[in-house]
Amino acid sequence: MPAPLTLDGFRADLAEFLYQQPDEVDLEENPLYAGLDSLRIVTLIERWRETGADVSFIELAECTSFDQWWQLLSARQGGAGHVTA
């Protein structure tokens, strides 16, 4: 089973796509204003799903800050928010 996503890992993932150092990532920044396009967001979603965080593109697109992304991702660790039919 993959290790769960941590805040440090989340920051490192964002930093990679924003060409920053993890400690330079402003969690209050709007992801779209920060320079993340839809392809990068989808790539991040795939990476985070591998850690057990079950989120969709639409859910992240509705968030207005990286902090809101983190709140959603941390709540969904291990598929906690996944509903099965």
From Swiss-Prot:
Q: In which pathway does it act?
A: Lipid metabolism; fatty acid metabolism
Acyltransferase as a keyword? no
Among InterPro entries, the record links this protein to: ACP-like_sf, PP-bd_ACP
Q: What is any one GO biological process for this UniProt entry?
A: fatty acid metabolic process
* Entry cofactors: pantetheine 4'-phosphate
The Carrier domain, residue ranges = 1-77
Q: Which domain of life is it from?
A: Bacteria
Pfam families recorded: PP-binding
Residues where O-(pantetheine 4'-phosphoryl)serine is found: S38
Keywords carried by this UniProt record: Fatty acid metabolism, Lipid metabolism, Phosphopantetheine, Phosphoprotein
The UniProt similarity line reads:
Belongs to the acyl carrier protein (ACP) family.
The UniProt function text for this chain reads: Acyl-carrier protein (ACP) involved in the biosynthesis of a unique class of isonitrile lipopeptides (INLPs). Is the dedicated ACP for the loading of activated acyl groups catalyzed by ScoC.
Protein name in UniProt: Acyl carrier protein ScoB
Q: Give the lineage.
A: Bacteria, Bacillati, Actinomycetota, Actinomycetes, Kitasatosporales
